[in-house]
């Protein structure tokens, strides 16, 4: 088990910022293998204003984005860029997405991603998001990494 990664360290691994950062903390990972992260869902999320008034539900596409961000963190931890460069991970594909549980304010989404394959700049991972022990969503995700100057 590795040390947890807080939001300040996450900001060094992802380009996302408010209101689109969807990973609050990494609680465990093993490079080139798996990562477990947390997203604390609060009523202050900007998407709850319109999804849905009086019945706030986290959009499924944002659960998938949270998994994609967890995948990008694992890929960033697993591969070092050249000096003065960083990797930007593009969401390149998704298969087998399934939604099993509604996510509402006050829930803590546990994001679990596992590396399924990596070839050059392409990363295939399987992700599952849980609320407690209940599966909220799952998907197979593909990302493409591009090395850019800082």
From Swiss-Prot:
Single GO cellular component term: membrane
Major enzyme class: lyase
Positions of transmembrane segments: none
GO molecular function, one term: (3R)-hydroxyacyl-[acyl-carrier-protein] dehydratase activity
EC identifiers of the protein: 4.2.1.59
Localization per Swiss-Prot or TrEMBL: Cytoplasm
Pfam families linked: FabA
Reactions mediated catalytically: a (3R)-hydroxyacyl-[ACP] = a (2E)-enoyl-[ACP] + H2O
InterPro entries for the chain: FabA_FabZ, FabZ, HotDog_dom_sf
Stated family: Belongs to the thioester dehydratase family. FabZ subfamily.
Function: Involved in unsaturated fatty acids biosynthesis. Catalyzes the dehydration of short chain beta-hydroxyacyl-ACPs and long chain saturated and unsaturated beta-hydroxyacyl-ACPs.
Protein name, as recorded: 3-hydroxyacyl-[acyl-carrier-protein] dehydratase FabZ
